[in-house]
Amino acid sequence: KKMEFIIGENDLKLSNKLTAPPLNSFVLPFYLTGSPTLETPKIRGRICRLVKPVTQILNRHNYPDPINSILAEAMVVTSCLSTTFKLDGIITLQAKGDGPLTTLFCDVTNKGDLRSYAAYDEKAFEQNQFLQNYELKTLMADGYMAFTIEQNGPSKRYQGIVELSGKTVADSVTVWFKNSEQIYTELITSVKKVGDLW
């Protein structure tokens, strides 16, 4: 089911807590109508939480934690993107670099099926050179990130490419939105391992 919250200036009630059951996963669209009197803009966005699918995928691969963290962020960003576009097919986020993390891949279908994997230099991580570094640009070095939308049927394939930049997947995606879509975009992501869950 698709849900969308539309919140106007008189509807918003502030709370210092937002809680959900620990394993619930969702992508929730929202729309803030803005207020001429308060001079606030209209804002469309997504709130995403993917505990169970991210944990299941990462547990299958046994990657070092810095790679798990970047891959988890990529899954969240790709899942949000999949609900942003009219999708009847697959959206793919793929990054290639010449650092110790060489490949990052994630795709989501219009049915919500999620896949993700990474390729990396095991020796570099075995020597503990990168075990404390969670920054995308440091781990991938020079490279690019590509976004591909493949629609079912006769629709065209779309691909956008941007150079890797910043510390996170969200930083590179933000640059892509700014350059390609020319839409002011802000992505705020947070990834954390709590016990055995991501």
Region annotations inferred by a language model:
Residues 4-198:
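Interaction interfaces in information-processing and related assembly proteins
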